[in-house]
């Protein structure tokens, strides 16, 4: 069975602005192997530069919902995320919740779906180590 990918915001921004990672994003999307996190969608909406970009995003989000490929945080993800943030703070010595809570929700979305999280942010590997200590597995591809 082929992997399903959940691209984080960094990948979509590089794809939209600079056409980076286009082969992976296009091929995965065309073959129906992409899950969109509602948290990633929120960040993309926040960064939309034009009405045209917003409309394109509207169509993408709706199409992902239609094929049940739109992942929203589950009720228990908020508490799980808090525990992970506490562990991350202990691991790193300090962390600001505002800097990481969205990452945690995206990560948990990938874990919940069994998807490979694709990111251009190498720091995401730290979360994989923390999840491993909790008995969970983050499948991660850093570009």
For each predicted feature, which ranges?
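Short, well-ordered alpha-helical scaffold segment located
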Residues: 11, 40-43, 123
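Short, contiguous strand/loop micro-motifs
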Residues: 12, 44, 92-94
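Acidic, PIN/NYN-like endoribonuclease modules and their adjacent C-terminal/linker elements
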Residues: 2, 107-143
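Short linear capping/connector segments at secondary-structure termini
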Residues: 41, 61-65
């Amino acid at each position: 069975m082929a992997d399903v990918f959940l691209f984080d915001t960094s990948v979509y921004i590089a794809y939209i602005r600079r056409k980076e990672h286009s082969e992976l994003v296009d091929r995965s999307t065309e073959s129906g192997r992409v899950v969109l996190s509602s948290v990633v969608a929120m960040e993309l909406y926040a960064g939309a530069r034009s009405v045209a970009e917003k409309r394109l995003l509207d169509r993408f989000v709706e199409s992902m919902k239609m094929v049940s490929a739109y992942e929203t945080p589950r009720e228990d993800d908020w508490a799980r995320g808090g525990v992970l943030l506490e562990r991350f703070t202990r691991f790193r010595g300090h962390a600001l919740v505002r800097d990481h809570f969205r990452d945690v929700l995206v990560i948990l979305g990938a874990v919940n779906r069994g998807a490979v999280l694709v990111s251009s942010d190498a720091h995401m590997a730290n979360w994989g180590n923390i999840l491993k200590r909790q008995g969970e597995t983050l499948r991660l591809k850093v570009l």
